[in-house]
């Protein structure tokens, strides 16, 4: 398990309905980028197995098997839809709201939802089985992945099950990329494409881009303060800057992680970084008569009472 970095964001002069921000913090609403990821994995496998083929010959050096079956035999709508999805995938499309809707339409019109496991040929099943064995922990989002047959059919049922957004999902603030999401957390599938682990560290500042244990500790008419944790490191500058631009006004950010002995404060105004400082934590003295005692954090002064805890 990681050390946890404690974060506090204080929004001031919020320019839109507070409820929009509260909904994002709470999570639970339909997650378009998670749906695009799930459907994208299925369409990727459909291409690798030759179930779907593009309308024209294609070349994809990161994973040649994706287009190794050549072009479709005719110009039917399912092939048009798959070709449109493939073009966005190969371009590394960012999963913003508009693109996610386009990708979902491609998935629907490809008719891949009707290709349940029992209808696939043995060669098609074998391709999917081999790739799933390689990526099941990433794609199945579980330490105990489902059998490939059940997992594949669950993808076919995706029209009825839209994944829920996680609390404070930073991928809703700065969109991730379709190809990176298919390559997934551990990567190793698409040559030259980052793993989502590496991408998340670069883009969001932390390896799991959501706010854990999110708690709104104050909410006024146009102000809101939320405490949350992130693994190892604070949420990145670009994310908080984007939040300040999206919701207007100013956002103050305090963070601390006592295991790494660091803390920081930043202020963002309408999408721009106004202040950014970091420092080491300051410590009191441990009780010399108690071998189990641990010194208290005593500074810097600006971090005291501005985070819910000091991480670790």
Question: What are these model-derived regions, one by one?
Answer:
Residues 1-312:
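Intrinsic low-complexity, intrinsically disordered or marginally ordered coil/linker segments
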